[in-house]
Amino acid sequence: SCIKHGDFCDGDKDDCQCCRDNGFCSCSGIFGLKWNCRCDVGTT
């Protein structure tokens, strides 16, 4: 099952299994820590 745009995703994975082809996992973070990871879509 894919993750809808705006839903939480696993920040440890480059591919967040978004439903959109250009989807990726966008996280807030600092010093290697990640949080508030959600599926976002790129401009490509």
From Swiss-Prot:
Family the UniProt entry places it in: Belongs to the neurotoxin 04 (omega-agtx) family. 03 (type II/III omega-agtx) subfamily.
Any single Gene Ontology cellular-component annotation: extracellular region
Keyword Secreted: yes
Domain notes: The presence of a 'disulfide through disulfide knot' structurally defines this protein as a knottin.
Protein keywords: Calcium channel impairing toxin, Disulfide bond, Ion channel impairing toxin, Knottin, Neurotoxin, Secreted, Toxin, Voltage-gated calcium channel impairing toxin
A Pfam family this chain is assigned to: Toxin_34
Main location: secreted
GO molecular function, one term: toxin activity
UniProt keyword annotation of Secreted present: yes
Species of provenance: Ctenus ornatus
Lineage summary: Eukaryota, Metazoa, Ecdysozoa, Arthropoda, Chelicerata
Function noted in UniProt: Omega-agatoxins are antagonists of voltage-gated calcium channels (Cav). Toxic to mice by intracerebroventricular injection.
Localization per record: Secreted
Disulfide bridge positions per record: C2-C19, C9-C25, C18-C39, C27-C37
Tissue and organ distribution: Expressed by the venom gland.
Name the record gives this protein: U4-ctenitoxin-Co1a
